[in-house]
Structures are given as structure tokens and as C-alpha cells.
Amino acid sequence: MNDNPAVNKVFNEISSLYKQYFEYAIKVRKWLEIPDDLSHREIGYGMLKKVDNRNMSFNTDGEYLTWVLKESPFHLYKSLSYMEYPDVVGGAAKKGLFKREVAFDIDTHKTEKCTHDDSWICEECLGEARNQVLILIEDFLFPDFGLSEKDLKIVFTGNRGYHIYLKPENPELLKKIEKWGKNERRYFIEYILGKNLNLRNMGSRWKNILIREFKKNKIATKKFEKTSDWKTEIDTRKDTTRRTIYETIGKVKSRLELDEKVMDDDIRLLRTIGSLHGYTGLMVKEITYSSLKNNQFDPLNHGVFSKFHKIMYKVNIKQEIDPLTLKGDTFDHKSTEIPASYLLFLFGHGIDFEILE
């Protein structure tokens, strides 16, 4: 604990709020995910750091839930991998990895339209995260891999991103992708990111995506549609057109902010569905593809634990900060009475404030 009573008061209050949340999420709503085959999954958690400890495992659901209720961690994780020895310290070989979930992590940065500090969030950067999920699904996962909405699990991370799990209903396909090794997963994500794009032998999916973008930039596409050797065709164009073509290809290849380590790392941890994100206090929440597609999910509304928006605190915020809107209410450094939902966000971002009597 800190020697400063005001700091201790804030930490104790934050800890109490997390405990209240887990009591409700576990005992009342059954929100908290219990990872499949729990005894073969590694569990990690963080309090003041993103990850304070990992290499934990639990034999039963009850043991796991009892631990969560007792500790009420600010960050809670489970491994994507299934392991024979999840509590052993070391890599995949020591842990005895025998299969692994396949998931994408889209984690966006602030956009050109954002007016806030890099670490803050707003409708613009959250909207960009949504758009990137739809690009991943509609440009690749649906048409290229024959997946449907029922084959995906989409999770809002509680910050500026989403996790997209591949969960095919076909048991044989699910078994196959969960047996993928690092090389197969690496090939998968590099294809989607266009890292190995061969302009002398363009595949149909990337050809269709790029032709669509060329048309937006008023680049003639008829000859590109008829050939797979794009390099030769590009070389016939004028310098300005050629430059525009390469710039367009570059922008398309870089439009997805995918965390490649999540696909590459054999023993990667991801946030547990139904927990809270320790930096924002927002819920790690599973949503449907249709709610995302139809813009029915608003992270700054539906990601807020409603009960925490009704508990109010008198505070003194000691530094200037950007505004943040939660559930339609906007707060900033001038706010003197704030809900617990905003209190968690301030704490997670290391903002200097005190709770008043």
C-alpha cells in the first residue's frame, strides 16, 4: 500500500468496485466466461500492472470462480492454448500445448479525426475499430474461408479493439484449425495483411479488393480484371498513375491494425469475456455480428456496467484531461461529481485525482 492516505482511499474504493462487479457478474448474471476445458487453460491476472501473474490453473469451475470473487482482479486473462501443464513456467514445450484457439486481435490507435490524447478513447477511434472488424469478416473470413456469422465469436475488449475468435460449427473444421501450429497461423494472418502479395500472380480475393479501391480512386481497372500479372500492367502506366496505384495498394494492406503476436504466440493470453478492462473499467463483452454490422452496439454506452453509472462520487481532478462521454454524459477535469464508471476510467489511466468526503 502507499503511504499517502488519499491514494490508499482511491485504491481501496476501486478494489471495492471491482469486487461489486464480479459479485454481480458471477452470482447474478453469470456473465463471466469459464474457459472450456478449464483445467488445461492457463489463467493470468493484473492489478496495478497489465499482467502481475500468470501460470495459474484451476481444476474446477467452482475453484476458479471462488478465486475470482476473492481477488477481483482489474485485468483477467485466459490462455488461447490448451496445455497439459498450464501452471508450469516456460514456453509451449514445457507446458505441453496440445491445441490452441485461433483468434484475431484488432487494436486501433487514435485516428486523424480524434482530438484527444493518444491513450484516450472516443467515438471516432471506436468506430474505426468497428470498421476494421467488418473489413476482416466481410473481405476475408466470409468470402475466402467460407465462414458464417455462426462460426465467429466477436468480443469487445473493453478498450479500442475487438477479439474475433474462429469457432466453426463444423466439428471437423474446428478440430483442424485448433491443431494449427505457429506456421499455419502465421501464413493465415500474413495472407490477410497482404504481406506476401505477389503482383505477378494476383489471387482472386485480393484482386477484387484492390479493384474496388482502384475504382474509388478513378483508376482504370479493365485490364487488371483480365490478368493476374499486375506488375507488367502497372509498369505500362504513367508515373503519376503508377504512384497512385502503389499508394492505394499500400493503404489497403495497412488498413487492418491486427496484433500479429496474438496469432503468432503459442502461449498468448486474451482477456476473459465478462471481466472488466483495467484501463477503462468497461466490460469485455461478447456481441453479435449483426449488432456490429447494424451499428447497434455502442461501446461507450453498452460497454458501461450500468450500476456503476448510478454510483456517484465527489472528486477533485488535479490535471487537465480530455473529455469522455459515457452513456451520453460527458466528463472532464472540471467535473466535480462523477459516476463510478468514470472513476474507473480515471484510475486506469493514472489520472491524478482524489475522492472527497
UniProtKB/Swiss-Prot annotation:
GO molecular function: DNA-directed RNA polymerase activity; metal ion binding
UniProt key word Hydrolase: no
SUPFAM superfamilies to which the protein is assigned, alphabetical: Prim-pol domain
Named cofactor requirement(s): Mg(2+); Mn(2+)
Active site: D105, D107, D259
GO terms of biological process kind: DNA replication, synthesis of primer
Role of this protein: Catalytic subunit of DNA primase, an RNA polymerase that catalyzes the synthesis of short RNA molecules used as primers for DNA polymerase during DNA replication. The small subunit contains the primase catalytic core and has DNA synthesis activity on its own. Binding to the large subunit stabilizes and modulates the activity, increasing the rate of DNA synthesis while decreasing the length of the DNA fragments, and conferring RNA synthesis capability. The DNA polymerase activity may enable DNA primase to also catalyze primer extension after primer synthesis. May also play a role in DNA repair.
Protein name: DNA primase small subunit PriS
Gene name per UniProt: priS
